[in-house]
Amino acid sequence: MEIRTPNRLPFHRWAVFPVLLAQFVVLLLATLVLWQWKGSVSGYSGLCGGLIAWLPNVYFAWKAFRFSGARAAQAIVKSFYAGEAGKMILTAVLFALTFAGVKPLAPLAVFGVFVLTLLVSWFAPLLMNKRLSRP
């Protein structure tokens, strides 16, 4: 059996694009607020925290939404598991690199913007254009 793969949609046409865009906007706004009120160290620390949350989500979206169609059910499940595993590994690596390589660092800003960026996912159903209809 052949697995159908659709033509690659542009990034802005993905179903998850509004969520990723909202996360990116939130991380930029939080970074600008921190930079303005707490200084440059908190600003770039917040940027690091936001990117630690956002980049793995982009990776997951890229990895998980590659297949479509009923014939590709196994490939879809495998790609979701692989995407989630890669997301966790990437998050751990980015945290390690940030705390090992970025000096000086404001840990509260890193974790604060990280959590704030992840909170956008809780409101993802409000950001999605397509409504699921019940038969």
Swiss-Prot record:
Main location: membrane
Transmembrane helix is among the record's keywords: yes
Single Gene Ontology BP annotation: proton transmembrane transport
The keyword RNA-binding is annotated on this UniProt entry: no
Protein location: Cell inner membrane
Classification via Pfam families: ATP-synt_I (PF03899)
Membrane topology: Multi-pass membrane protein
Sorted UniProt keywords: Cell inner membrane, Cell membrane, CF(0), Hydrogen ion transport, Ion transport, Membrane, Transmembrane, Transmembrane helix, Transport
Membrane-spanning ranges: 14-34, 41-61, 82-102, 108-128
Disulfide-bonded cysteines: none
GO cellular component, one term: plasma membrane
Family per record: Belongs to the bacterial AtpI family.
Role: A possible function for this protein is to guide the assembly of the membrane sector of the ATPase enzyme complex.
Protein name, per record: ATP synthase protein I
The species this protein was found in: Pseudomonas putida (strain ATCC 47054 / DSM 6125 / CFBP 8728 / NCIMB 11950 / KT2440)
Name of the encoding gene: atpI
